[in-house]
Regions:
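TRNA-recognition modules of translation machinery and tRNA-sensing kinases, especially anticodon-binding
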Residues: 1-381
C-alpha cells in the first residue's frame, strides 16, 4: 500500500478525467458501491476455488459475527447492487462505470499493490455480440484518448457452461498425463477447476500448457457463432486483435467472450486491462431474472506506470498565474484579483511574502505561465 502525492496525482486525474469523458460518450453512468461487502458475495461471485478467494482477500469477523471482506474486485458488487435495486426494471441495457480502490493480499511485484485502483465498466441486460464489440471499442477509445501507444488487444471465448463442461472433461484427461510436471497450484487446479490451469503464469509451465487442447476447438454452435460475430464487429470498427486460446482470466464467472490488453512497459506481468462476458453471474448471486452482462476493469496503477514509462505524456501541474504583491495594500487587492481569475477557471498562486526576488524565484520553480507583479502604482491605476 502506498501514498499518491502531487505531481504524480496529476497523471491519475488525467486518466480518470479521460475515462469519465469516454464512458459518458457511450452513455455509461457512475455507480459507487461499498468498500466492505459480505464475504459470501465474493465466494459465490468470483469463485470459491479462485486464488482471489482462497489466498488474497482481506476478510474479518465483525462484532455481530458476520464475515466482511474488503472488495477484491468490483463486478460482483455492481451485480449485487443491480439485483438489490431492481435495475433490471429500468429501460434498456444498464451501463455503469466505477473508479475506486480494491484490496488483495498479493505478492508484491512491479505495478501491483495490496491496495490498488481500478477503472471499470459493466453493461448488463443483453447477450448481443454487438455489445461485446462496443465495450471493447470503448476500452480502445479510452487508451487512445490518453495517448497510450504500444498496447495489444487479446481475445478469446471460454464458451458457455455446456461446451465448457465437455472441454473440461477433455482437459482433465490431458492434465492427468502432465500434472506431475506442473507447479503446485496447477496440480491443485487440475482437480478442482482444470480451466484455471490455462491461466497459469509460471514460466516453466508454459510449454506444457501450450500443448494442451484449445477451448476454441470445443465451442458449441451457439458460442462459435457468437465469437465469430464479435470478431466481425471488431473488424468493422478497424480494431486490431490477437486470438489467444489460453486467455481464460482468473475469475470463474466468465462466459463466452474474454479479452485483455497488455503493454510491453510492464515486463512479464504485462496486463493493464481484463474483461469478459458473465451471462450467469446475476443468477449465481440470487437473481431470479436472467441478466447477461459484459464488463472490464483497468488496473489504474499499471496503466499509469505504462503511461509514464512510455513517456507519451508530461503531467507537471499547470500554474496559470503567479501574483507577486508588493506591500500590504497590494496583497489585499491581489486577493480580490486572484478570486476573479480563479472563478474564470485559472490556477492562481499569490506569493506569501513581499520580497520581489524571492517571489520571482518561486514563480520560476512553480513553472507559472504568467507572473503578475502588483505594487502601489498598479493599485492606483
Amino acid at each position: 500500500m502506498r501514498d499518491l502525492l502531487p505531481p504524480a496525482t496529476g497523471v491519475w486525474n488525467y486518466v480518470e478525467d479521460a475515462a469519465r469523458r469516454v464512458f459518458r460518450s457511450y452513455n455509461y453512468h457512475e455507480i459507487r458501491t461499498p468498500v466492505l461487502e459480505e464475504t459470501q458475495l465474493f465466494a459465490r461471485g468470483v469463485g470459491e476455488e479462485t486464488d482471489i478467494v482462497t489466498k488474497e482477500m482481506y476478510t474479518f469477523e465483525d462484532r455481530d459475527g458476520s464475515s466482511l471482506t474488503l472488495r477484491p474486485e468490483a463486478t460482483a458488487s455492481v451485480i449485487r447492487a443491480y439485483i438489490e435495486h431492481r435495475l433490471d426494471q429500468r429501460p434498456g441495457v444498464q451501463k455503469l462505470y466505477y473508479i475506486g480502490p480494491m484490496f488483495r493480499r498479493e505478492r508484491p511485484q512491479k505495478g501491483r499493490y495490496r491496495q490498488f485502483f481500478q477503472i471499470g465498466a459493466e453493461a448488463i441486460g443483453s447477450e448481443s455480440p454487438f455489445l461485446d464489440a462496443e465495450v471493447i471499442e470503448m476500452v480502445v477509445e479510452l487508451f487512445r484518448a490518453i495517448r497510450l501507444e504500444g498496447f495489444k488487444l487479446l481475445l478469446n471465448s471460454v464458451g458457455c457452461p455446456e461446451c465448457r463442461k465437455a472441454f473440461s472433461a477433455k482437459l482433465r484427461e490431458e492434465l492427468a498425463k502432465v500434472a506431475p510436471s506442473l507447479c503446485a497450484d496447477c496440480r491443485r487446479r487440475a482437480e478442482t477447476n482444470p480451466l484455471r490451469v490455462l491461466d497459469c503464469k509460471v514460466p516453466e509451465d508454459q510449454p506444457i500448457i501450450d500443448a494442451l487442447p484449445s477451448i476454441l476447438d470445443h465451442l458449441c454452435e451457439g458460442c462459435r457463432t457468437h465469437f465469430d460475430a464479435v470478431q466481425r464487429y471488431l473488424t468493422d470498427r478497424a480494431i486490431e486483435f490477437e486470438i489467444r486460446p489460453r486467455l481464460v482470466r482468473g475469475l470463474d464467472y466468465y462466459t463466452r467472450t474474454t479479452f485483455e490488453v497488455v503493454h510491453g512497459a510492464l515486463g512479464a506481468q504485462n496486463s493493464v486491462m481484463g474483461g469478459g462476458r458473465y451471462d450467469g453471474l446475476a443468477e449465481a448471486l440470487g437473481s431470479k431474472i436472467h441478466s447477461p452482462g459484459i464488463g472490464f476493469s483497468i488496473g489504474e496503477d499499471r496503466l499509469v506506470m505504462s503511461l509514464e514509462e512510455s513517456r507519451k505524456a508530461e503531467f507537471t501541474p499547470e500554474l496559470d498565474v503567479f501574483i507577486a504583491p508588493l506591500g500590504e495594500p497590494a496583497l489585499r487587492e491581489c486577493a480580490i484579483v486572484a478570486r476573479e481569475l480563479r472563478r474564470s477557471g485559472l490556477a492562481v498562486e499569490i506569493a506569501p511574502e513581499g520580497r520581489l526576488k524571492r517571489a520571482m524565484e518561486l514563480a520560476n520553480k512553480l513553472a507559472a505561465r504568467f507572473a503578475l507583479i502588483v505594487g502601489e502604482d498598479e493599485i492606483a491605476s
